[in-house]
Regions:
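Interaction interfaces in information-processing and related assembly proteins
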Residues: 1-85
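Short functional micro-motifs and their immediate structural scaffolds
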Residues: 98-99, 117-120
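Short alpha-helical
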Residues: 28, 98, 110
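Short Cys/His-rich "knuckle" micro-motifs
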Residues: 101-106
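Cysteine-rich micro-motifs
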Residues: 109-118
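Cys/His-enriched microdomains
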Residues: 89-92, 110
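Short metal-coordination and nucleic-acid-contact micro-motifs, chiefly zinc-binding Cys/His arrays
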Residues: 84-87, 108
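Short, cysteine/histidine-rich loop/knuckle motifs that typically chelate Zn2+
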Residues: 93-94, 114
Length: 120
């Protein structure tokens, strides 16, 4: 039996694939955050007769999206750091393997399903 299957941790090939996905997602999030910053700096000029309430709601939505992206970006950074330190794939809380299926669905998961449910 292969060691990765035995431990529930990704093998070297799986780890490379997950690292590639994390790095790709990080690049997308950084581009989105840059766009949020540019939009915030530019501001939406009020048009004559424009709907101020709608503009305010759009700004709030943009801020919420930027905060979500920043949180995901932070999780990705932690996951990449754990890859470098050899701790990737181990639950932060119980130290058991997170599991292939969970990491495939969410490569920046830091907890196993059970601990994440208890943490939420």
């Amino acid at each position: 039996m292969n060691a990765a299957v035995k431990t529930g941790l990704p093998d070297a090939h799986g780890l490379r694939a997950l690292r590639f996905r994390l790095q790709g997602r990080r690049a997308v999030l950084l581009a989105e955050l840059r766009a949020h910053v540019r939009a915030a700096r530019a501001g939406a000029p009020a048009e004559p007769g424009g709907d101020e309430v709608l503009l305010a709601q759009l700004r709030e939505l943009d801020l919420a999206e930027a905060q979500r992206d920043a949180g995901e970006l932070e999780s990705i950074g932690v996951a990449l750091g754990r890859m470098e330190s050899g701790e990737y794939g181990m639950c932060l809380d119980c130290a058991n393997p997170i599991g292939h299926a969970r990491l495939a669905a969410n490569p920046h998961a830091l907890r196993c399903v059970e601990c994440e449910a208890a943490h939420a």
